[in-house]
Each structure stands twice: as C-alpha cells, then as structure tokens.
Amino acid sequence: SSAASDVYKRQGEEPSPAPRTYVLSSPKVRLVQTEEVRAQLGSAQQTLIDARAEPRFKGEVEPLDPIAGHIPGALNRPFAHNIAADGCFKSAEVLKQEFSALLAGRDPASVVHHCGSGVSAVPNLLAMEIAGLGSTGLYAGSWSEWSNTPGLPCARG
C-alpha cells in the first residue's frame, strides 16, 4: 500500500480506481533512425545538432563510447546552453535568437537532435519548441549507436 492510500484509509475515504481507456495520439516528435541520418548526410534536408559538451563533440575526450568525435556535418549546441541562471529554460526570445544564429539560415524543420545516447538531446528539442521554431526530429540512437556501427564516418574537431 502507498502512503497516499494509507492517508485515505485513515480519513475513511478509500479510493476506488475505475477502469479507463486512453487513446494515444501520434508521436509529437519525429524519431529518426541511423540509416536515415546516414542517407541524409550533407543534405539540406537534414541539420544535425549534437547536444554533448564541446570536448566530447570535438573528440577531445570520450568516456563512454569506443570512438571519439561526432557525426560529420553536425552542429554543436550543448544542452546546458538552454538554461538560464535561475535553472529554468531561457526565454523564448533568447532561445530563438540563439538557435537562429546556430542554424544560420537552415530550415528549423530539417533539424535532427542527438547527443551521446538520446537523453541530453531532448532539452535542445524542447528549447526549439519553446522558441517557436516548430517540431524537430530526434535521433535517439545518437553517438553511441553511430560510433558502434561499422562503416559510418566520424569527424573530429
């Protein structure tokens, strides 16, 4: 029994769960697989944004994966750059300015976010939504999957 149900019992208000039906909507995020990323390398149809810290992106250090570096052509936007001094996301206006500068005229809809394992990319994805730049993609396999797939190109610097 949970602490919450114990409180209800003491108050004489035993909760009675009722069956519910939930209808799931289609995913709000476009999930991209390794083969799609590879097929679109260098294409204007895809703008990769890597959310890892700059030393990992540049290949100066790699504590987790067998190869250091990044997917060729990727831009670097460490996820922590989205957070203001108060610990919350920066304002929509600031995020829009920063991402627009990073994209340098590229279509925001072409963006596919990634990181080391797909987790740290999400703050960048959310930041672009907050900025009003629209829905973007997520390559959840990220650097871990890319660097562990034989034959895929890797870049450093």
Each language-model region and where it sits:
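A short "linker-to-beta-strand initiation" element
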Residues: K9-P27
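Catalytic-pocket segment enriched in acidic/His residues
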Residues: K96-R106, V119-A131
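C-terminal soluble interaction/assembly domains
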Residues: V111-H113, V119, L125, A131, ...
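Short active-site-adjacent structural elements
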Residues: A85, S120-N124, E145-N148
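Short, small-residue-biased leader/transition segments that mark boundaries at the very start
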Residues: S1-Y8
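Active-site-adjacent beta-strand anchor residues
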Residues: D50, H114, Y139
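Positively charged, proline/Ser/Thr-rich regional signature most characteristic
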Residues: Q33-A109, N148, A155-G157
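Cysteine-dependent PTP/DSP-like catalytic domain, specifically the C-terminal lobe
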Residues: G134-G157
